[in-house]
Amino acid sequence: DSRTKMAQVMVDKVFSFSELGFQEYETAKYITEILKENGFTIETGIAGIPTAWMAKWGNGKPVIALGSDVDCIPKASQKPGVAYHDPIIEGAPGHGEGHNSGVPLNVLAAITVKEIMERDKIPGTLVLWPGVAEEQLGTKAYFTRDGYFDNVDVCLFTHVSSNLGVSWGEASGTGLISVEYTFNGESAHSAGAPWRGRSAADAVELMSAGWQYQREHLDPLQRSHHIISNGGDQPNVVPSQASIWFYFRQITYPEIMELYEKGNKMAEGAAMMTNTTVEKRILGSAWPRHYNKTVATTMYENIKTVGLPTWTNEDQMLAKAVQKEVNSKRDTDGMPMKIGEL
């Protein structure tokens, strides 16, 4: 309670930055300065990512890591405290998924736990890290690849939700692969000599159309989305290069790979039909999450002890207005009055 104002200031400050993935420079500078002032050592640019960092304090076991995402969403600019769509800047990015809240609250938790550990001479190490470019699957796999979690005993991950709770076992969310297919053909003048060209854009369109026909045969839990990330330069030139960007989602690793292989075959087929070549580039990955029961049940007891915040009438009015605005079917009664189920 003594740090309520600090919490609100930090959450609002990160909200004001509204930085897209791999562009979280102001957020990184702001958060790491606060951690430095409170005795944490900072390593910046981890895993070769300029906006990524890791903060540490303490020594010995257990090593407890606190993580949360920090990037925002394109074209989600929004005035705070307004229930309807009202951007601060039209078309600008914004924190439409609440990624402005997690890391600030982890910082406050870490500072508080650090004080308790110092007072009671409790051994252990606290680690904080940001989920940079989470919306693009940008970093967590690379942190793991480069060994940043090798000595971690437990990782507690924070994300905004409709209630205060914790879970264990398989997560409800999917894992996925982010992959971009780039087709290379032959440029030509579209009017003067189109027969000399081999259109990479045609290959992209064929892959997109082919995947739409594939959807009927996907498992109910399989999800996929794609955009054309490069469609060529201008209409009077046969595009020599074009790209299409896919997310392939599923609950288990084998099923994610099954979707990925289907995508690869479709890309090869599109290249064959257009006499182009194709290259694939994995941009990121996130495997399905599995949460620890012992950690979850222990945290849940603490959640029951702490309880929910005391909501004001203004809090409830805004929450209900937002729920009505988005036509929510699940949450309609404003802020929760009971702690969520484990």
Residue ranges and their predicted role:
Residues 19-20, 129-133, 283-288:
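Conserved short loop/turn motifs at secondary-structure junctions
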Residues 8, 32, 107-114, 141, ...:
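Predominant activation on well-ordered alpha-helical scaffold segments within soluble catalytic domains
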Residues 205-342:
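Metal-dependent amide/peptide-bond hydrolase catalytic core
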Residues 85-94, 100-101, 117-239, 249:
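Histidine/acidic-residue-rich, glycine-tolerant segments that coordinate divalent metal ions
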Residues 43, 63-67, 127-130, 155-157, ...:
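Structural recognition of the beta-strand scaffold that forms the well-ordered cores
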Residues 1-95, 100, 104-124:
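Acidic/His- and Gly-rich active-site-bordering loop/insert found
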Residues 3-4, 11, 15-18, 39, ...:
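Sec/Tat-exported extracytoplasmic proteins
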Residues 14, 35, 55, 66, ...:
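Divalent metal-coordination and catalytic microenvironments
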